[in-house]
Amino acid sequence: MAHPSGSGGTSFAPTPTHPHHLSRETSRDELEMAESLRLLNQTHDHQKPRAEATSQEQQQQQQQQQQQQQQQQQQQQQQHAQEDPRSEIYHSLEDAVPIADGPPTPSTAASLQIPNMNYETPNASITGQVCSNCKTTQTPLWRRSPAGETVCNACGLYMKARNQSRPVNLKRNTQTQPTMSVQQSPTPGSTDGSRTCAGNVAGSPRVATYVAADQMAAGTCPGGGRCNGTGGQQGCSGCPAFNNRVSKTAKFALAQANAAPGENRGGSDAASSTSAASASTSAIPACQNCGTTITPLWRRDDAGHIICNACGLYYKLHGTHRPVAMKKQEIKRRKRIVPAADTSSQAPSSVANYSPPQRPSQTPAFEHSVSPDPSTALESREAYTPEPPRGPIAVDFTHYYSNSSVTSNPVALTPTVQPSAPSPRKRSRSATLDPEEPVNPLPHRPNAISAILNPSQTEVDANIDPSLSVPLRTSGGTSPNFTLSPEEKAAKRERLKREAEAMRLELERRQKELEELEND
């Protein structure tokens, strides 16, 4: 326990807890430690009033610098308003960042350290783009919700994948901002001067390259599917390149407005005025590879540098950086609206859109049966009912044992069916033809495909056994017995003889096989 020593210092010698214990002598190390602690306390007590005085002086200097910057900004705005009444152009209703039309102010390249920004403050509306779901003002791509509200890229992708709003607790706390270097035009009076290639600027990863926004006049977009990100046309309000440019410009201006002035407290007045002039100039991001400031989407390469959409896709596809010679001053917007189709483009009909005509109530005569073109016959066949799968011909045995009248005329008993008599069997396509049209096509006509696809009634009936044909019905009485004509009897007799002979030969062959098996 520390207690005052005899020399006036503080001694760290332990105090005896009991009176009967003897106290030991203080060592040399303990005395040196106590002396150094006393000197340190005295030095700290002397520095306290000095630090308070220094802090008051710094606060006064900061207030003076803020007043000077405000006066300089007001003077510059008054000068621009006197020179040109159209000196300030606002890209949107919420955007209050002035972009000058005149030539850029000559200044040297300066670097600006962006401090931490609080996006929940009311000043965040100056960016012009706020997510309606998570209230963020930072996103690589602004999207539209199904309800038409502006949402950030994360909320839009979440809604597209899950069909529900993204929870607010998933929002990342991105309060720290990287260092951004500002490069401004070195030559005064050059409105369309070439941009400084950002690829030649040495910088560490996560360093965004910014260039002066005065290098390209605002409101000079040509329109018509070509975009340079400056606006001025009717369709620029929904252009991603224009919205991205406005958002980045406003974000940089907001960072300058929230930046604590007087970071370099030990600098001279000339250095302070130079930094204030450079800080008042609006800036926009530039591609680290080609130096362009026009892109619908900012990307990052493997090293963490900010690059444009074209350079990012080229690097992703080819594995190398995009050549600077491929850089274009304008980008082509994708046309998402399908133009109206012309009448000439509708002339060729597509096979996928072909719909066959409806079949009429009565099947017409097959007019294309005499056409020598096979394709014509195939097209005409699509209008009829497709044929059933090939197989045994269907025969109706309902009236096989029915009674029929006996007539003395043998010709009337032939199996030929008259056109006027209704056929009890299923009707084929040839039965629906007109009676005036010949059933069999002429032999000299080269329409073999039509004959195969549409067989005649005679060819169909030739495959049926004559004994199974339906007898004709007459107006006379009915006969209890069914008789055949002599020709049919002779044909049946010959058929039975052939079958008997075949059976006899088969029986002899089987008998020989049995004898061979018995002999073995």
UniProtKB/Swiss-Prot annotation:
It is found in: Nucleus. A zinc finger (GATA-type) spans 131-155, 287-311. Disruption phenotype: Impairs the repression of siderophore biosynthesis and utilization genes in the presence of abundant iron and thus produces siderophores even under iron-replete conditions. The keyword Glycoprotein does not apply. Residues 1-86, 168-199, 326-391, 406-447, 467-495 are annotated as: Disordered. Residues 326-337 have a biased composition (Basic residues). Residues 22-31, 486-495 have a biased composition (Basic and acidic residues). Its main location: nucleus. Residues 221-239 are annotated as: Cystein-rich region (CRR). Residues 58-79 have a biased composition (Low complexity). The keyword tRNA processing does not apply. Residues 168-194, 342-364, 406-418, 475-484 have a biased composition (Polar residues). GO terms for biological process: cell fate commitment; negative regulation of transcription by RNA polymerase II; positive regulation of transcription by RNA polymerase II. SUPFAM superfamilies: Glucocorticoid receptor-like (DNA-binding domain). Keywords: Coiled coil, Metal-binding, Nucleus, Repeat, Transcription, Transcription regulation, Zinc, Zinc-finger. It holds the Pfam family GATA. GO terms for molecular function: DNA-binding transcription factor activity, RNA polymerase II-specific; RNA polymerase II cis-regulatory region sequence-specific DNA binding; zinc ion binding. GO terms for cellular component: nucleus. Residues 486-520 form a coiled coil. GATA-type transcription repressor that regulates iron- acquisition genes through specific binding the GATA sequence elements of target promoters. SRE1 targets repressed under iron-replete conditions include genes encoding a number of key iron-regulated factors such as those involved in siderophore biosynthesis NPS6, SIDA2 and ABC6, as well as the high-affinity iron permease FTR1, the catalase CAT1, and the superoxide dismutase SOD1 encoding genes. The conserved cystein-rich region (CRR) localized between the zinc fingers is also involved in DNA-binding and transcription repressor activity. This is GATA-type transcription factor SRE1. It comes from Cochliobolus heterostrophus (strain C4 / ATCC 48331 / race T). The lineage of its organism: Eukaryota, Fungi, Dikarya, Ascomycota, Pezizomycotina.
